[in-house]
């Protein structure tokens, strides 16, 4: 199968030594069981309420330190895993949105790991994790209306040849590459720091791919561990 291969700027080792991520490319099949994601999401919410996993706060704290290192304010713009967990701890649950989105949110909650899900077909070139120079463009929504922003110079971003696909490392994904269960090619990135055991990172990846295989039998996927 033809896979997108993301790249990581070596400069990121300065602020996030030991960063590693699981990159998963998927060629989707028709959805046969749309409830897989919603069921996983409910179970993951309960796991968060029960204080699982035991190392979750250490991993979140490590992400907060990395965010501060490139100038972000994690109390205002936290990493995606912390944002999800805060919502669950406040509301006790999380509403279902889309079968695939529900599944990767469940993985993020269950393993306290930032997970990005993207429509591969919307990419122009390969994903790259870099420091922004401030000239890049980012498409998003504000009060329901499409707007274009630019990252701060020195901000960590995911980008492709066209522009930013995710701001502040994993804080907010753009509209252009947004994923849904109807997309034919998908790319997922599970991002970890050393406070998350590597076997737990692989377990998170297995939860995602096992769930996708139940949801859409016949899909194909390829996983690659990357890092700095």
Question: Locations of the language-model features?
Answer:
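Charge-biased, low-complexity intrinsically disordered regions
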Residues: 1-228
């Amino acid at each position: 199968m033809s896979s997108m291969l993301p790249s990581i700027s070596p400069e990121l080792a300065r602020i996030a030594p030991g960063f590693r991520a699981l990159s998963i490319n998927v060629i989707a099949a028709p959805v046969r069981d749309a409830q897989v994601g919603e069921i996983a999401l409910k179970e993951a919410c309960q796991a968060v309420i029960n204080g699982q996993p035991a190392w979750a706060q250490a991993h979140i704290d490590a992400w907060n330190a990395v965010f501060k290192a490139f100038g972000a304010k994690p109390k205002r713009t936290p990493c995606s895993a912390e944002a999800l967990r805060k919502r669950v701890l406040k509301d006790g649950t999380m509403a279902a949105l889309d079968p695939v989105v529900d599944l990767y949110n469940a993985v993020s909650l269950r393993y306290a790991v930032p997970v990005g899900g993207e429509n591969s077909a919307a990419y122009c070139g390969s994903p790259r994790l870099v420091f922004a120079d401030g000239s890049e463009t980012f498409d998003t929504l504000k009060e329901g209306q499409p707007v274009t922003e630019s990252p701060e110079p020195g901000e960590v971003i995911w980008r492709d040849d066209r522009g930013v696909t995710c701001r502040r490392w994993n804080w907010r994904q753009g509209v252009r590459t947004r994923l849904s269960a109807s997309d034919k090619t998908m790319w997922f990135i599970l991002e970890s720091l050393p406070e998350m055991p590597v076997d737990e990172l692989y377990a998170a990846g297995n939860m995602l791919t096992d769930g996708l295989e139940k949801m859409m039998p016949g899909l194909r996927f390829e996983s690659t561990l990357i890092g700095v």
